[in-house]
């Protein structure tokens, strides 16, 4: 659609297609949020209740690519100001991990002093087996995600705490 509009009206509109986004002010509702904010909330509840297990949906092998919201915002500004010959550009990190790997990383960052066992609820769906974007075009134009994962998790978690306890 952008391409047709650009051809007809001589505009330079671009469509950026982001991968799964996370960060401050996300939706952490247990039933209608995406897996990552739901996982942050679940880990927080385990931390509060001093639980020794976390249960995640499916077998934990579904793969997801994530991008921190600040990187996505930076990409939007970058490409608004960049002359490009393509109307659709995927925005992401170009790397994915399993749900289990993300769970392990979040546990290590948010509850570093405790060993929590990951259990799998096989009665729940795994979701799409893999969600990973080809970000080679964004890289070709000089854009890459820059945010440190651990720092972005801490910032996101602090936002979750503010959102949850300052209502």
Language-model features, listed with the residues they occupy:
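A short, flexible beta-alpha/helix-coil linker loop
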Residues: 20-24, 62-63
């Amino acid at each position: 659609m952008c391409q047709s509009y650009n051809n007809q009206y001589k505009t330079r509109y671009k469509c950026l297609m982001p991968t799964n986004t996370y960060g401050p002010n996300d939706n952490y509702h247990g039933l209608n949020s995406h897996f990552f904010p739901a996982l942050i909330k679940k880990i927080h509840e385990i931390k509060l209740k001093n639980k020794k297990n976390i249960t995640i949906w499916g077998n934990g092998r579904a793969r997801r690519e994530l991008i921190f919201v600040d990187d996505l915002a930076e990409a939007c500004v970058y490409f608004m100001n960049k002359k490009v010959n393509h109307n659709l550009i995927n925005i992401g990190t170009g790397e994915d991990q399993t749900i289990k790997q993300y769970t392990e990383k979040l546990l290590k960052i948010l509850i570093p002093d405790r060993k929590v066992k990951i259990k799998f609820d096989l009665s729940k769906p795994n979701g799409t087996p893999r969600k990973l974007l080809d970000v080679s075009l964004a890289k070709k134009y000089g854009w890459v995600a820059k945010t440190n994962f651990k720092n972005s998790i801490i910032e996101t978690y602090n936002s979750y705490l503010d959102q949850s306890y300052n209502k």
